[in-house]
Amino acid sequence: MSSISKRLSLRVSADVIYRGLTDTRLERLFPEFFTGITRKLTSSNKANSELQFTTTTYDSQIQIKEIFKLKVLESNATEIIYTTSTNIANDPVVESIVYMHIANILYALLMLETGYVNGLMERQK
């Protein structure tokens, strides 16, 4: 499978996104949802605002490599360039898994923005 790249702008600071991406509380609190899946931070370059994860499933049969590049835009806004690739090509089942994984990551980032913006609005009241 060739790499898939998505670009997303959020009204959240890069630091909040960085902490959200590296947070592992869900894996620790609900391990039953992560059976057979290992997600490791394989590279972190905070100076260049880049994170790289490797997600391995089912005895390393499927490996998903993810790179997040964070670029600070105007005040409190960040652009995320999210690139995904896998070790298996031309397999519709694996492609389906990867597309669902990408959708979940993008949804989680949008929910991070929603929670962040709502929290700011609550503070201003």
Give the positions of each predicted feature.
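Hydrophobic/aromatic beta-strand elements that line small-molecule binding cavities or substrate pockets
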Residues: 38-43, 55-57, 64-72, 84
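A conserved amphipathic terminal alpha-helix motif
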Residues: 84-125
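Intrinsic-disorder/low-complexity, polar/charged segments enriched in Ser/Thr/Lys/Arg/Asp/Glu/Gln
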Residues: 1-7, 16, 50, 63-65, ...
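A short, structured loop/turn motif at beta-sheet edges
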Residues: 11-15, 43-48, 69-79
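Hydrophobic ligand-binding cavity/cleft-lining segments
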Residues: 1-38
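Mature, Sec-exported extracytoplasmic domains of Gram-positive
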Residues: 34-36, 68, 89
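Short coil/turn motifs at secondary-structure junctions
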Residues: 13, 58-60, 73-75, 85-89
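Short, hydrophobic/aromatic-rich segments at coil-to-beta transitions
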Residues: 44-54, 114, 118
